[in-house]
Amino acid sequence: MWAWALLPICLTIWATAGIWIVYGMSVSNGSVNLSDGFPYISLCGTDPPQSCVFGQVLNVGAMLGVWISAIRFQQIRDYNCHSVLNSVSLAMGILCALGTSIVGNFQQSNQLETHLAGAFLAFVIGNIYFWMQTALTYMVKPTHGGCYIGPIRFCLSVACTALIVLMAVFLKMNMKSISAICEWIVAMILFLLYGLFAVDFWHLDGHYFHVKKRTVIPNEMQVSTVTLSI
């Protein structure tokens, strides 16, 4: 059912529009002074009222991220790919979403250490998640999106990794404005990578999760023998 493809598209549009709205609010009310350089995303969402919008945008985005990660995990399993990489990838996707929520709820002006921990989960773990998804793209058959989706994911993951490294390097060199630009580009790439799941979800007929009671395997059943004297 093609409607499932709207889920990752909604996340991409929601998150992209949301953080740029926060940027616009922070600039318009003077919370951010562009003459001091281009601001980090978190700096734009530090002060109210935009901090409220920032938190809501990231919380909804995190919820959608968990949902998408779970559906993608099950979709890969349904293609008879029971690789450990798929399970680890699900964990990475959930951690990325958790970090995103932490970033939105713990502003850097209030809880800097917690905020930075959330940013690490959102950016670094999120990047690792999409590296795993790139690998799974080549492992799973059929491959939706033809021969293009794999290279596109690979190139975007490479760009994301390079920009995260550059972001840290420029920050170390006290070139905060360039570092902030790298951060914004990384965020846009991650949103785009989530949006690419629309290619895979287009082919979903539906999804459901259920809990099964573990059944005892016959070979694992304990056999009791009693010797009777005759």
From Swiss-Prot:
Keyword annotations of the record: Autophagy, Cell membrane, Cytoplasmic vesicle, Endosome, Glycoprotein, Membrane, Transmembrane, Transmembrane helix
Q: Which domain of life is it from?
A: Eukaryota
Q: How does it sit in the membrane?
A: Multi-pass membrane protein
* Membrane-spanning ranges: 2-22, 51-71, 84-104, 116-136, 151-171, 184-204
- What are the GO cellular component annotations? autophagosome membrane; endosome membrane; plasma membrane
Instruction: Give GO terms for biological process.
Output: autophagy
Glycosylation sites per record: N29, N33
Topological domain ranges for the Extracellular compartment: 23-50, 105-115, 172-183
* Side Cytoplasmic, residues: 1, 72-83, 137-150, 205-230
Subcellular compartments: Cell membrane; Endosome membrane; Cytoplasmic vesicle, Autophagosome membrane
Name the Pfam families on file: Frag1
> Which family is annotated?
Belongs to the DRAM/TMEM150 family.
Q: What does this protein do?
A: Modulator of macroautophagy that causes accumulation of autophagosomes under basal conditions and enhances autophagic flux. Represses cell death and promotes long-term clonogenic survival of cells grown in the absence of glucose in a macroautophagy-independent manner. May have some role in extracellular matrix engulfment or growth factor receptor recycling, both of which can modulate cell survival.
Q: What is this protein called?
A: Modulator of macroautophagy TMEM150B-A
Record organism: Xenopus laevis (African clawed frog)
